[in-house]
């Protein structure tokens, strides 16, 4: 499995997470459509928020990055949210 973590801070980050929370049904549906989807979490932080996506392979997490980027461009461009810092890698342990 492969995971990608997007950390949103700075300009527009808190507002973006307000919007994601308000439209969580739409976000859930979109992320579940990603090929090889395993798990997804949105975590609110003091500076904005973090998303964690786990897929069966890197192709899935790459697709999730594009899906997230497209959704933000289509639905939150007016927030001028700073690009997230992105970390990714192989999953060593996955518990639920």
Feature annotation, model-predicted:
Residues 1-52, 56-70, 77-96:
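Short S/T/G/P-rich N-terminal loop/turn motif that feeds into the first structured element of a domain
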């Amino acid at each position: 499995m492969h995971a990608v973590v997007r950390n949103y801070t700075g300009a527009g980050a808190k507002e973006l997470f307000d919007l994601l929370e308000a439209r969580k049904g739409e976000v859930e549906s979109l992320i579940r459509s990603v090929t090889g989807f395993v798990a997804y979490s949105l975590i609110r932080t003091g500076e904005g928020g973090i998303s964690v996506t786990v897929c069966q392979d890197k192709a899935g997490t790459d697709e999730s990055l594009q899906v997230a980027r497209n959704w933000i461009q289509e639905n939150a461009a007016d927030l001028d949210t700073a690009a997230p810092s992105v970390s990714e890698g192989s999953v060593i342990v996955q518990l639920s």
